[in-house]
C-alpha cells in the first residue's frame, strides 16, 4: 500500500503523467482506477486532483504584482507553517529568478494547502516544480527547478 499522502499522489502523477508535455485529464476514470489499483485511497486521490485543479485555476487569475524594490513579508500564519528554512528557500529561488512574484505566491498558496503534510523544503521543491510546470511561460525556470529537485532525489523519494 502506498503512503497515504496527497504529495505522494501528486509526485506519482507528475513523474508518470505530467512530464513530456502530456496533458492530464483530471476527470478521467481510467486515471482514478489506476491510482486506486496502486493502493492510493480514493479520498487522498480526490484531494490530490482537487489540489491540481486549484493550481490550474489559480494560475490564470490576474495578480497585482509588487513594486520592483518591494520585499515579501510573511504573515504570522505563513510563518507558523513555513519555517525559516522554507522562507529562505523561497527567497533564494526568487533571487535566482526561478520564481517571480506571481509564481512565488502560487507556490506559497499551494504549499499552504498541503500544510497537513508538514511543510518542509522537500515539499516546497515539489510544489514549486508543479507550479512551474503549470505555467507555460516559465520553461527556463522549470528546467532549473527540475535539476534542483532531481539532484536531491537521486536516491529516491522519502
UniProtKB/Swiss-Prot annotation:
Coiled-coil zones: none
InterPro entries: Smg
Family: Belongs to the Smg family.
Listed HAMAP family: Smg
Protein name: Protein Smg homolog
Amino acid at each position: 500500500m502506498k503512503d497515504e499522502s496527497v504529495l505522494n499522489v501528486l509526485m506519482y502523477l507528475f513523474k508518470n503523467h505530467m512530464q513530456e508535455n502530456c496533458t492530464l485529464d483530471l476527470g478521467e476514470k481510467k486515471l482514478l482506477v489506476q491510482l486506486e489499483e496502486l493502493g492510493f485511497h480514493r479520498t487522498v486521490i480526490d484531494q490530490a486532483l482537487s489540489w491540481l485543479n486549484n493550481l490550474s485555476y489559480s494560475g490564470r487569475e490576474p495578480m497585482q504584482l509588487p513594486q520592483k524594490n518591494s520585499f515579501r513579508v510573511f504573515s504570522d500564519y505563513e510563518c507558523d507553517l513555513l519555517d525559516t528554512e522554507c522562507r529562505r528557500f523561497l527567497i533564494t529561488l526568487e533571487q535566482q529568478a526561478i520564481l517571480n512574484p506571481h509564481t512565488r505566491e502560487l507556490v506559497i498558496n499551494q504549499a499552504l494547502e498541503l500544510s497537513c503534510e508538514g511543510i518542509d523544503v522537500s515539499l516546497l521543491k515539489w510544489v514549486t516544480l508543479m507550479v512551474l510546470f503549470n505555467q507555460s511561460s516559465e520553461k527556463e525556470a522549470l528546467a532549473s527547478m527540475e535539476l534542483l529537485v532531481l539532484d536531491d532525489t537521486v536516491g529516491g523519494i522519502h
